[in-house]
């Protein structure tokens, strides 16, 4: 018997909420940026491993149809660093330390 749309929608929403919570463990990532990561098609912190922060930034700008503040690139650099390394330098977990 096929799932009802409401059941499927609830499953998707549950998955989304779990992913958003997962993203918020990354320093500098809150509700808004976790939504941006979801909208980029990422579903877990591990999806950020070895991603190109510049490409994520460019894709987000295209998705939103506007220029995104450059600080978002710095957050993406920090997030990719966090996801790609098991041991972290505390200074590199501050997004502002990823400026050009």
Where does each model-flagged region fall?
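C-terminal extensions
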Residues: 2-27, 31-100
